[in-house]
From Swiss-Prot:
It comes from the Bacteria. The gene is rsgA. It is found in: Cytoplasm. PANTHER family: SMALL RIBOSOMAL SUBUNIT BIOGENESIS GTPASE RSGA (PTHR32120:SF10). Zn(2+) binds at residues 288, 293, 295, 301. It comes from Syntrophotalea carbinolica (strain DSM 2380 / NBRC 103641 / GraBd1) (Pelobacter carbinolicus). CDD domains: YjeQ_EngC (cd01854). This is Small ribosomal subunit biogenesis GTPase RsgA. Monomer. Associates with 30S ribosomal subunit, binds 16S rRNA. Keywords: Cytoplasm, GTP-binding, Hydrolase, Metal-binding, Nucleotide-binding, Ribosome biogenesis, RNA-binding, rRNA-binding, Zinc.
């Protein structure tokens, strides 16, 4: 397989020059699980593990994620090893979520959902999944990643208010395309397929039951991902997709399917994404007399004036303030985690020195 068909471009070519003398070859991560990485490259599909320096010296967000390009060695007795991860063009990150016991395993460390994505397709069902405020959160995530957002309102066949809901989402999308589809009936799929360019990488993100895997199956004309029925009584989807995986489509595009996101906590470095999602709020805030205006009791507040005039939706302001507070909290967590890591490192270095002297003597 030609690696250009997998999204290889001049960016990755230039960064890989540093590794050509190390007898490494490039491959793309298509699946991650159990400490193993499934790769796709010129030699087809292969399975690899991390080389020691990557396994022990990388934070969670620096480990290979689905969509990453990596440098691997030739098959050895111990299997194929990943020795390098090429710099990402884009990365969808969220704050680390709690596990099933309700505990955050690595607070302050982001989780990479997908790497090197050109277009992030935000899929929202037109059933009980429909939630404009949640779509705003996804938009902040995608804007911050560097990928282009595309909103898909799926399941139009069961919604009598399709056009009204499309208009509502367009009013908060600020230029982001909004498509209406029915994965079951095939409506709107041609328009969606027009965004799938050969060599481009897209990711499907959204809640469980929004129809991501069904859309993928229709676009691929094959049952790539098993899909589950939705309970008509509660409108909730079963978590059919249990892992993130990249699929090459017949037309040449590459699509990453993801499990439904139980939690979508914003990462601390999301200020730019927040501004792109709420440009009208930022614009009104710029009209405040004071640069540090809290939009409460200060005189000449652009935000309060916009609320009074009816030119700013109170729900939009509330959503903006909630996201801003969450990002500030995540930033603080990240800073605290960095301080803890630095202290741990300072303690580790003397211990390593003592161990070396015990093993090799004091050099006298």
């Amino acid at each position: 397989m030609n690696i250009k068909q997998l999204g290889w471009n001049a960016h990755f070519e230039s960064h890989f020059e540093n590794y050509r003398g190390q007898d490494l070859v490039p491959a793309r991560v298509i699946r991650v699980g159990g400490g193993f990485y499934t790769l796709l490259g010129a030699d087809g599909e292969q399975t690899a593990t991390l080389a020691g320096q990557l396994r022990h010296g990388s934070t969670q967000d620096a480990l290979p994620a689905v969509g990453d390009w990596v440098g691997i060695d030739s098959p050895q007795e111990g299997g194929i090893r990943i020795h390098a991860i090429l710099p990402r063009q884009t990365a969808l990150k969220r704050a680390t979520v709690s596990n099933r016991k309700g505990l955050v395993e690595k607070p302050g460390v982001p989780q990479v959902l997908a790497a090197n994505v050109d277009i992030a397709i935000i899929v929202c069902g037109l059933n009980r999944d429909y939630n404009p405020r949640r779509i705003e959160r996804y938009l902040t995530l995608v804007h911050e990643s560097g990928a282009m957002p595309l909103i898909v309102l799926n399941k139009s066949d069961i919604c009598p208010e399709t056009q009204a809901r499309r208009a509502e989402i367009e009013s908060i999308a600020f230029g982001t395309p909004v498509l209406v589809t029915s994965a079951q009936c095939g409506d709107g799929l041609d328009e969606l397929a027009s965004h799938l360019k050969a060599g481009s990488t897209l990711v499907l993100i959204g809640s469980s039951g929004a129809g991501k895997s069904t859309l993928l199956n229709r676009l691929a004309c094959a049952e790539h991902q098993q899909t589950s029925e939705i309970s008509a009584a509660v409108g909730k989807g079963m978590h059919t997709t249990t892992h993130r995986e990249l699929f090459p489509l017949p037309g040449g595009a590459l699509v990453i399917d993801t499990p439904g996101l139980r939690e979508l906590h914003l990462w601390g470095e999301s200020e730019a994404g927040l501004a792109s999602t709420f440009p009208e709020v930022i614009g009104f805030a710029a009209q405040c007399r004071f640069s540090d205006c809290q939009h409460d009791q200060e005189p000449d507040c652009g935000i309060r004036q916009a609320l009074h005039d009816g030119t700013l939706d109170p729900a939009r302001l509330e959503s903006y303030l909630k996201q801003r507070a969450e990002i500030a909290s995540a930033t603080l967590q990240s800073e605290l985690a960095a301080q803890v890591a630095q202290k741990r490192k300072r303690k580790t270095i003397p211990r390593q020195g003592k161990r070396w002297r015990r093993e090799h003597g004091d050099g006298q």
